[in-house]
Amino acid sequence: MSTDNKQSLPAITLAAIGVVYGDIGTSPLYTLRECLSGQFGFGVERDAVFGFLSLIFWLLIFVVSIKYLTFVMRADNAGEGGILTLMSLAGRNTSARTTSMLVIMGLIGGSFFYGEVVITPAISVMSAIEGLEIVAPQLDTWIVPLSIIVLTLLFMIQKHGTAMVGKLFAPIMLTWFLILAGLGLRSIIANQEVLYALNPMWAVHFFLEYKTVSFIALGAVVLSITGVEALYADMGHFGKFPIRLAWFTVVLPSLTLNYFGQGALLLKNPEAIKNPFFLLAPDWALIPLLIIAALATVIASQAVISGVFSLTRQAVRLGYLSPMRIIHTSEMESGQIYIPFVNWMLYVAVVIVIVSFEHSSNLAAAYGIAVTGTMVLTSILSTTVARQNWHWNKYFVALILIAFLCVDIPLFTANLDKLLSGGWLPLSLGTVMFIVMTTWKSERFRLLRRMHEHGNSLEAMIASLEKSPPVRVPGTAVYMSRAINVIPFALMHNLKHNKVLHERVILLTLRTEDAPYVHNVRRVQIEQLSPTFWRVVASYGWRETPNVEEVFHRCGLEGLSCRMMETSFFMSHESLILGKRPWYLRLRGKLYLLLQRNALRAPDQFEIPPNRVIELGTQVEI
């Protein structure tokens, strides 16, 4: 998205603050509290405070500023980012075996996101509502119900779209970051000694003094960079420069000031560890701060929900998830979508998590494994792109990868300590999603191969039909074909059972390209195969939704006139049965049958009028 289009650079930068930095921007609500809460065996001591502050600051510099904003964001596909995009880019110039490994890494990274997305809304909103413990301690029993109410309203408005509400996100988040900076600066001025923690030697001293415990404590430090993947995933919406500009001018200074302000407060008053963020504020500001914190966490949750919608659409379009209903909530912005099934499944999961864990401190124990796991995978995939696509020197790329992994692997390993205390949750959810995605992709491939393994040549069949035509009836018939050079099952069964053929036959294939968008000039390719047969291949990007009516419009512009209400669409509907398999493949087959039964049918998927569709069933053993 170029900054000279439609909006000015300041406007785009402000919008990026409102969407991209919601998650990482609400981390000060709980990060330092979890670091120094006593769970690691040391209390609010000067060396511990300085050590944690130094680690947080330099983690923000190295992971966010250097790794993601400077290096990873160079890897874009027509301006788009995200873990599946990175997977696609990394596999472009590699061997088939290497590509398979990279695809597995990308799918694991995407699955980790699904695991983490359940926790983000819960921990963000709960940590804000927990400000009630400071404002009115007697209301602490209302934290869980209020958190559920807030998130219920958020999930309910998803179907209406967020275009109108979204206009408020940017000014609210800008206000939030200014408040973070103001509260932190006020505390730092009162205790400037805390600025010594900017020296990275305090991080080194922390490890030397606390040894093994300091390593385990990295599991809490990583809370400061949760949401870092959003910087790369949302690159297509705002562009690289506005996201970088927002970070270095607003977000990084505000986060640094607030974390160090909390540290200054704790050095002066160790008892403030119960909630150092809210105790930074004067008494008169607690209620307004509670309100703005709740709004900021709702915005952070919205960004995550929108992110899971986008990831799901991309996975569906790339063939890793079954087709599902995707509703566009904005006529102007193709990225604003609503997926009902995903929305309500996520809502149920979030409510269960809130009721089960009851407090954001308990949830913090579940946070981090998926984030750091994705960071490791991002390092490997992005350096693969640097070597294979950008042709950087292999030794230089190796040094970059080693530098990244020297940070990522200790963070990931430290978070494994959380496995039994809550880390199993995102890991389990991620594992389920990985199984679902790999099952759909592999079983779909098996089905298509089974359907076409005994097929005749398309060209030979057309030549035979032209030479000895069956009864021809007036009108146009469109046969949906998953592959270009194979005979559609529906065509074979129509000839077998009805023994008729329309006077004009179009074989339509809708293809997803390895790009977010396809230009209208390249949308449709038309080839006349015989006097009465045409092949139409319509190409779409993975951020686009195929629409047959649009394809017909493009065909008309290219000289092949088609009228939707005068055309019959023939589609095959496969009734699947499982063949003989080992028990583990049989389980996978049963999962695929379940996914297939609940998948969105082709007429709904491609917006074809139901009264123009003729489905011909066939039984296939897989």
UniProtKB/Swiss-Prot annotation:
NCBIfam families: kup (TIGR00794), PRK10745.1 (NF008015). The chain crosses the membrane at residues 9-29, 49-69, 103-123, 137-157, 165-185, 213-233, 247-267, 276-296, 337-357, 363-383, 396-416, 419-439. It comes from the Bacteria. One of its GO terms (molecular function) is symporter activity. It is found in: Cell inner membrane. One of its GO terms (cellular component) is plasma membrane. Responsible for the low-affinity transport of potassium into the cell. Likely operates as a K(+):H(+) symporter. The gene is kup. It comes from Escherichia coli O157:H7. Its main location: membrane. It catalyses: K(+)(in) + H(+)(in) = K(+)(out) + H(+)(out). InterPro entries: K+_transporter, K_trans_C, K_trans_N, Kup. It is a multi-pass membrane protein. It holds the Pfam family K_trans. Keywords: Cell inner membrane, Cell membrane, Ion transport, Membrane, Potassium, Potassium transport, Symport, Transmembrane, Transmembrane helix, Transport. Belongs to the HAK/KUP transporter (TC 2.A.72) family. This is Low affinity potassium transport system protein Kup. The keyword Repeat does not apply.
